[in-house]
Amino acid sequence: MARLYQCPRCGFQVTPQERARDRFCPKCGTYLRPAEGGGGEGWRRVFPYEPYPQQVEFMGDVESTVVSGGTLVAEACNGFGKTVAALSCLLPTGRPIVYATRTHEQVAQVLREVEAINRARSAGHRAVNLASRRLLCVNDECRLLPLRDAQEVCRRLRSRGECPYESDLDRVPRGLPPVLGVRELVSQARRRGVCPYYLSRKLASKVEVVVAPYPYVFNPSIRRLTGLDLEGKFLVLDEGHNVDQVGQEVLSDSLTERTLAAATQEVQQLQRPTQPLEGLRGYLEEACRGSPRLIAPGELAQELEEALGASIPRVLDEYAPLVERVREAKQSKGQAPICYLNGVLIFLELVEESPRESYVGLFHTTPSGAPLLEYRCLDPSLAVAPLVEEAHGVLVMSGTLSPLETFTRVVGLEGAVVKSYPPIQRSDRIKMTIDTRVTTAYRERTKAMIRRLGKSVEEAAQQVDHGVLVFFTQKGFMKNCLAEWTKAGIVELRRGAPHLAGKRVFLEGRDAQHNQRVVEQYKRAAVTPGGAVLFSVFRGRNSEGSNFPGDQARGVVLVGVPYANYGDPLVKAQIAYFNRVRRGLGNQWYTMDAFRAANQSLGRGIRGRDDWCHYWLLDRRYHQHLDLISEWAKGQGPQVV
């Protein structure tokens, strides 16, 4: 790695290029000197455990690439210790870290690792969780409102002195714990009479590690509002396989007939002209009739202006001043100051200002039949590139990034250092069987094939004790399989409950709360001598973010390959867009997307170094694309039957 320079007073490290611009520490003004040992292996002063060789390799790459100001895309298996290893490399530099992740469970894991480092090294590294008002606000008047409305209500309450919690913090209160999650922020702030939300924002500019959900990092407006500056900082994108989807979601928007109706009513109550909104509502209702329809952005903008009866910029100028009046009018009546007009204007502004060659519009309806217009970003690099340009160094890491070359092309990180690391589990603790006798390909999805799949699932469940996870391509297909397997006697009903190979079968819940209860019941049954089976779907609640350690998942069965619906207009548009960017990239993306979902489900079965699992991949197409299966899942090589 390039020789680093370090402040002898506070330990802050800089690259040679940064020192050439300024020879004094940007934090304390002390003259910068060459780091001892060239600046490498600083992690040895911080890492709280005895490292495995694979972790040493990973940390060496983080230091040589990310610390030096580059971008590293790293794939390493579940249980690898990626979080603590990354923190151990970056903390010694003294440079702030923004750590972005997907779920609250993953946020808590990052904070626990900082605490583990502090305990093991008697250190005082500080970390804070940036979270939404919904989690941190303790004023009921605004905490449950949508983001944009909550911001405005909060501003108004503070300007009028009507919020009892202090938000203008000149300095950070003394005596705070070094690591602050949501619960600690709320309790500590309440005790001091300050606002937890603004306390977290104040701390974010002072601490070494800021842990934030993905939208806080990817959404430019949220970054501005929260003061989350990436310049000169390390950026860690954990669960990096989500980067493309999250980036596209942040840069996309939708418009519903319900929103337009509510916005029209808001403007009516202010006694202002509603013709543009009424014209837009009629246009949306007409355009969404029939089958889903794609529309090019330029054509969409033209049709929107015809429906509005004016140019989009003129409509924005005319109606933007009404947003504040709508909120004030609602609040004066004791109503929640949600402004639907603002949502319409934000949608129109996106259509007007977006790079149209990277977008597409889609007219369709919601499941309840309501008209819906989506304006979809097709290029995830539009969200990723600004982050990489602003941050000092970037680490994108996940257990499921394969195929790495396609992933980096899709997200625009072709200049990054890319690496996949060996698993920390012994290869003989991971077994894989690929059944080429079966497939879920639509043309071959006969009753006989479904029963053959059922026999394969039954054989898998018989071969391992305790818990078995079974993933299906779609919920409807899962229910069809269960019905057909019950008819064939593969699944038996015992006291009204389905059983497979003597194990009780549980089905993924219909919503988050129901699923949580189902998973808890499954886990209790899985660790008993009789064991249990959990039926779930790829890309569902149990395929990502859920943990099934030890006996909770001794077997994982993939029934089919989770290709996206090729008939979906947005899928077709995405394939066509990537094919325009680079010949064949769209088709590569389509396959990568399926195998990424499969790899993510495989990851539920291995949660630590001493864990073990047997994988069954029930579809001949897995054998045709062996190179797309994450290396850590292959053990000593798949057995093909």
Indicate where each model-derived feature is located.
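Conserved pre-motif I regulatory segment
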Residues: G37-V73
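A substrate-engagement module of RecA-like helicase motors
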Residues: G39-P53, G94-V210, F218, E278-E285, ...
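Walker A/P-loop
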Residues: V67-A86
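Signature of the SF2 helicase/ATPase Hel1-core->accessory helical subdomain module
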Residues: P92, E105-R112, R192-V209, P213-R314, ...
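A contiguous, basic/glycine-rich beta-loop/short-helix subdomain that forms a polymer-engagement track
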Residues: L185-E208, P220-G227, E318-T440, E444-M449, ...
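Conserved RecA-like P-loop NTPase helicase motor core
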Residues: T436-A448, F506-R621
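Conserved interdomain hinge at the start of the Helicase C-terminal
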Residues: V438-T473
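Conserved helicase motor "Helicase C" RecA-like lobe of SF1/SF2 P-loop NTPases
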Residues: T473-G509
